[in-house]
Amino acid sequence: MSFRSSIAAVVLGAAVFVSPLVASASAAPAGWVAAWATALQPIPDLAAPPPLYRAPDVAGRAVRQIVYPTVSGRAARIRISNAYSRAPLVVEAASLARAGEGAALAGAAVPVRFGGKASVTLAPGQELESDPVAIDVAAGRPYAISLQMGANQRMTVWHRVSNQFNYVSAPGDHVSDPGAALFRTRFTQYAWVSELAVEAGSARANVAAIGDSITDGLRSSVNRNRRWPDALARRLTASGAESIGVANLGISGNRLLSDSACYGTSMASRFERDALSRAGVKAAIVLIGINDINFAAMPPRAGLDCDHPHTQVTAASLIDGYRRLIEAAHRHGVKVFGATLTPAGLPAGREATRLEVNRWIRSGGGFDGVADFDAVLRDPARPSVLQRRYDSGDGIHPSDAGYTAMADAVPVEQLQAAVGGK
């Protein structure tokens, strides 16, 4: 099989295992809301992957992942996923606790059970929510989700860019260990855990922020929660909307219309699973399309060609993709806000496509609201590039200050109205 054919097999095979198992958020019990979430993607299945795509050894070890909920609650549950895998996922035990410094715990580890059992095995493609856990969850504080992995478990699915240090223990059962000494392996991905939901009362709601690396927070400060969805969550809290959680469902490199072996399935394919299935979701903010415009012009690469397929797009094809997202959201009773594509210093032809897409987004175009990220980030003298103070240094991804400016551009009052108030 050629490499290009193998890439297609990875992506298309993954889709077979995922799509039948998506559940609607409307089926979630009342009063539960996603306080934290991430979008998972397959790890390229290669004999000798590049360093960026090498997963740590997790067999018979505890994996401890640090998450920051955006809304408080009096009980919690986690969702684990075996999406994109061709083998079962075996979790021998799980726990949830307040996190301390590094991999250390600041509170007692509370066991997490699945159907009353400590261990669980998920079939390929299966997602599963845990039983509720009696634990007070405080928004903005770190929590550690620890999974004790099966003796032969391999990591086949992750969220590649976490901007958060997570940890793998030495071999053995360390799922409830309070100290950090045995968690010597550090990695900057999330694996298997796709959501932490809290029981927060009937008036609570979630906003799903979904996009590419700019939503993912690429090049923001590690362990500092400086992505724009983080800043939006803080802004909502400061405005008195403590009842609204924000889930970051960005995937670096993601495209609206094309799958990638490195950058996940297209948003057109993953939108319902990653955004519309979130507990308590009432609104989504969509920022996607710049990679569709840009990757088409990238030359094919030998080996792992993350930009494959190099599909040419037009403003019309992107707009058609947005309309499909809007229709899906409205079928689920979810309001959807469109975000304008941010400056990336593109050549004239690609820049013209970006500007045409932005004109459509600003005109309404079927979206329930607009977050004009382009307007706040662009250089007034050269609107095709980022303002220097908002540029992380690569001309594409914002700095911490740029991500904050993006959050400030979200129409919060309109967003609150869309989700049903504070």
Where are the model-predicted features located?
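Bacterial N-terminal signal peptides
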Residues: A9-P20
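Hydrophobic/aromatic beta-strand patches that form the interior of the parallel beta-sheet core
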Residues: A208, A247, F337, G369-A371
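Active-site segments of SGNH/GDSL-like serine hydrolases
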Residues: L287-D292, Y322-E356
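N-terminal secretory targeting modules
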Residues: S2-F3, S24-I210, S220-N223, A241, ...
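Conserved SGNH/GDSL esterase-like catalytic core that processes O-acyl groups on lipids
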Residues: W36, D57-Q65, P88, E92-A97, ...
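Catalytic His-Asp segment of secreted/periplasmic serine-dependent ester chemistry enzymes
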Residues: N254, G264, N294-A296, A302-L304, ...
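Bacterial N-terminal signal peptides that target proteins for export
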Residues: M1-V11
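Sec-exported extracytoplasmic/periplasmic mature domains
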Residues: T215, A233, T237-A241, L276-G280, ...
